[in-house]
Amino acid sequence: MSWFIQTCRSSLGKKYIMALTGFMLGAFLLVHTIGNSTIFWGRDAFNAYAHHLHALGIFVPIFEIGLYSLFFLHVITGLLLWQQNKTARGGKYAVETSAGGSTFASKTMPYTGIAIFVFILIHLVNFHFPEKTAEKTISDFVTEVLGNPLFTLIYGAGITLLFIHISHGFWSLLQTFGISHPRYDY
């Protein structure tokens, strides 16, 4: 077991953890987006989808705990890698130049990550924590929240930042697992 812990503490091990947790969070996000797209089929379809999810009973909180754990592990590992990279550099460089491999997405990963965390909190406050009743369905919450121009702007910005974060994260995942390698380029 010590080799496993030693690997997880290494820089490469942390990158594996980031890639795996990011992949699993991305898979959840894909399923969540597909499910939420039922709103385009009408209020009844969306409310039926939400009712189906809540009918899963005890599996819902178990799944949520797993999801929160993945998210927590992803965030903590990301912060550790960010700090480790900062420490390895030994401070700011005298001349700010791009090494050729950095992109806007790669340079802003910690910041987009923090913004996404805030966005997720806003999302949970708006849609997860409010009590759903027979008088007020989930589609009513969506209409109410996204009917507010401020929240529409917040959601648009949050999704944009999420896309930027995931675009670099997906590329990093391919790099970490050796899938994006000159040997495989055509």
Question: Where would I find each of the regions flagged by the language model?
Answer:
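Membrane-embedded alpha-helical bundles that constitute the cytochrome b-like, heme-associated redox core
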Residues: 1-186
